[in-house]
Amino acid sequence: MAVVYYLLLAGLIACSHALAAGTPALGDDRGRPWPASLAALALDGKLRTDSNATAAASTDFGNITSALPAAVLYPSSTGDLVALLSAANSTPGWPYTIAFRGRGHSLMGQAFAPGGVVVNMASLGDAAAPPRINVSADGRYVDAGGEQVWIDVLRASLARGVAPRSWNDYLYLTVGGTLSNAGISGQAFRHGPQISNVLEMDVITGHGEMVTCSKQLNADLFDAVLGGLGQFGVITRARIAVEPAPARARWVRFVYTDFAAFSADQERLTAPRPGGGGASFGPMSYVEGSVFVNQSLATDLANTGFFTDADVARIVALAGERNATTVYSIEATLNYDNATAAAAAVDQELASVLGTLSYVEGFAFQRDVAYAAFLDRVHGEEVALNKLGLWRVPHPWLNMFVPRSRIADFDRGVFKGILQGTDIVGPLIVYPLNKSMWDDGMSAATPSEDVFYAVSLLFSSVAPNDLARLQEQNRRILRFCDLAGIQYKTYLARHTDRSDWVRHFGAAKWNRFVEMKNKYDPKRLLSPGQDIFN
């Protein structure tokens, strides 16, 4: 969850207008002539080379690195994408790599195309009428353009009484972007990541061919693209499984000062039921967890937007009484419909769940909210941070999958070790996932154990010159894991060394990844910002 430059010689403005009109331009600022086939493309959209367009495509949410492209394509149809990629394949010596930018939410330039062509996918949705989101007549799935954002998929689905089963925490990401990574949130323990909930896709490969794929049709492309980091093609349509949408969510948080109790309860809430065939779970619809380091405990508790001032004061006092350097909180929901009887049943079911947990007595908190409001909860934080000028700051995030057998070691070494005594701005999230709900044939890489933890250290650099400290802190965390022999997998990361990518995927999956690259993007055109093949 989708989960992102130019120049000219003399006559920049005139050449830019010429390209937009589809007539030949002189070339780029490196002295490379525009291929005749590019200059002659009959595009419905616009290919822009002006500084406004290229500068906007040279940065991302991470706000750590930047790279100017040579041009930005604003497509008006999927035909524009086919035309661009077909020209790239048919032109000898084509010098431009191609990246597909959704909402620019990559962290380290993964959606950049330095000196190449960035495709602004949002333009595809802007040009579409009606919008490229359609719920099936039987309510079994929703078809969504790869450029569509999940908040719009939610709204269109709710209008028909249904909703996708698996989400991201933040809904203003594109369908194609998150499916190119995995797409995880607190529903993934029971439904798998978003990539496990895709029924069919339309993909334009690196050859410029539009291919419909599924588990039954062109299955190798289907599996490769899901979690494939944009290396094999661009998703222009995804068919996503949906379910009847609940109306409300009972939103609860339980507080712990003991990591063993915290993690055991998380696993209890997310474990498949015995005899359920691996697909039957307890009543909770969503389960995540948060870690609060004592140095910034009060601020971070308040920043959740969940706890009242009185709640924060009580939790801070609890930490003091127990001399706790870290506090943990399970966050969960139990979804239900609007009927009074359903609300009463939720009360009863929640009481039953509470009786099985080992949180600190008296430290269970709950709220009742609309289902859509819960799913869109992070957007309110975005609005608030934007007003304070704290949203568009560097985000040196570190996202990992840690095997269950080593999560206690991670807690001791990182939460109770490296992060102690540091200033932390941003949430620390940790929750278990079931490997059985992932399809290992897809490109996404996960640890080998049956249960592993998603760990998201979502740091923001808000103090002057703090970015370098946070980046070094991330390196210390990774060094600790390496030295401790923790077989983690990074998520949403960019490696710059081929051996790191081989380690990330594992030998067998890496060999398959290379095979699919050779088949579907042999010229190594796509998504150069991932630094896998470029």
UniProtKB/Swiss-Prot annotation:
Glycosylated; with approximately 10 hexose residues per site. It is found in: Secreted, Extracellular space. One of its GO terms (biological process) is cytokinin metabolic process. InterPro entries: Cytok_DH_C_sf, Cytokinin_DH_FAD/cytokin-bd, FAD-bd_PCMH, FAD-bd_PCMH-like_sf, FAD-bd_PCMH_sub1, FAD-bd_PCMH_sub2, FAD-linked_Oxase-like_C, FAD-linked_Oxidoreductases_BP. FAD binds at F100, G102, R103, G104, S106, Q110, D169, T174, S180, I184, I235, Y491, S527, Q530. Trans-zeatin binds at D169, E381, S456. It is an enzyme of class 1 (oxidoreductase). Its EC number is 1.5.99.12. Expressed in immature kernels and unpollinated cobs. Weakly expressed in kernels harvested two weeks after anthesis. It catalyses: N(6)-dimethylallyladenine + A + H2O = 3-methyl-2-butenal + adenine + AH2. GO terms for cellular component: extracellular region. Glycans are attached at N52, N63, N89, N134, N294, N323, N338, N434. Competitive inhibition by phenylureas. Residues 65-245 form the FAD-binding PCMH-type domain. Catalyzes the oxidation of cytokinins, a family of N(6)-substituted adenine derivatives that are plant hormones, where the substituent is an isopentenyl group. Cleaves trans-zeatin, N(6)-dimethylallyladenine (isopentenyladenine), isopentenyladenosine, zeatin riboside and cis-zeatin, but not dihydrozeatin, kinetin and benzylaminopurine. Belongs to the oxygen-dependent FAD-linked oxidoreductase family. This is Cytokinin dehydrogenase 1. It comes from Zea mays.
